[in-house]
Amino acid sequence: MNRYFLVVASLLLSITAVCQNFDEYFSDATLRLDYVFAGNRTSQAIYLDGLSTSPRWYGRRVRLDALPLAGNGQITVTDSISGRVVYRHSFSTLFQEWLSTEESASVARSFENVFLVPMPKQTVKISVELFDYHSHVMASMQHYVNPSDVLIRRIDKSAHPHLVLQQPADTAHCINIAFVAEGYTACQMGKFLDDSRRAMEAIFDHEPFTSLRDKFRIVAVESASDVDGTSEPSAGKWLDTVLGSHFDTFYSTRYLTTLRLKRLHDALACVPYEHIIVLVNTSKYGGGGIYNSYDLSYTDGEYFEPVVVHEFGHSFGGLADEYEYSNGDPMYFADTEPWEPNITTKCDFSVKWPNLVDSGEAALIEGGGYLEKGVWRGCPDCRMRTNKVKDFCPVCRQALSRLIHFYIDP
């Protein structure tokens, strides 16, 4: 059965089932799960790297056992006594993206990954699964977490100061986003806060974020670096910044990311966050966005605003790139419907945007997901395709709206 269909089915079941009580299984605290994903193109493995906890839980408190999107990986938390699934989370990773590169055919590498789940009141089983491009499980592992384990590190104070940029009236039913400074020195924090406000306004200038602005809490974390800027390996420039970001990810000149996920979440300790936007103090064009991991963007250039919004479409919305390359590496195949809501292989288009085709707001236009053939998008242009267009297309707006309501609706 198609993994995308399974997610839709689980969501429908969660809506009709008896509402799960957050307080029955969880404390108002966060359990941080550190993993190492490692391997090569033919063999992959998952390793537990560490556990820590901090006060307060800033993620969703509704639809805990459902997923809005399948992602390229999933975490499932199961109560060890009743066997009930009490929390699920989906994500994507740079590790899985790296597996599509030529290097993965001859070299094994490891990647840090960090995930947050609510702190259980009693022992739970945690299952982690990674999927390949055909939605088959390629790696999995299970482990148990006892909340009284003395080796779970307790963190009770922030590593850096933070400023609230926007506070919703209802903080119990809101989405928490944190801007994080990368490559800003202590004396440049005024610039970081200005850049954060610019990025925030750029996001809220796009529907459906404009109409749902009061559902978001935004903070800015003043994580100072000793030097300004970021590393540019192809130019022989390496800097020791607070988050270790760099261009040339997977030898792609403009691909700006950080592989130091533990550093990133250390910087966010005890801050109200669920989604992360890293602002990099550089004028060189670039960025990256990984679903339920982070949005990372350059700041000093003509396209800062559209880039940070585009990458947020990836990291928050799970949206796919809608552009194509003449020699793109295939990540989407005719026998598998992509989990991303804004592209289709027509394997199961019924779960995508047929309603918008019927209304005339969208169509089926071939080209997207880095491929010229075999993948279709809904509109000629979109924020997920180019920097020039002003808005998300109707397909992306619909997907983003559904996702936001999944998080916030009672």
Predicted regions: what they are:
Residues 200, 305-322:
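Active-site recognition of the HExxH zinc-binding catalytic motif
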Residues 150-207, 220-232, 238, 249:
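Fold-level signature of zinc-dependent metallopeptidase catalytic domains
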Residues 4-15:
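Sec-dependent N-terminal signal peptides
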Residues 189-192, 287-311:
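Short pre-active-site segment immediately N-terminal to the catalytic Zn-binding motif
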Residues 215-291:
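Active-site-proximal segments of metallohydrolase catalytic domains
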Residues 17-19:
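Boundary at the C-terminal end of the N-terminal hydrophobic targeting segment
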Residues 25-150:
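Beta-strand-enriched, solvent-exposed domains that form extended recognition/catalytic surfaces
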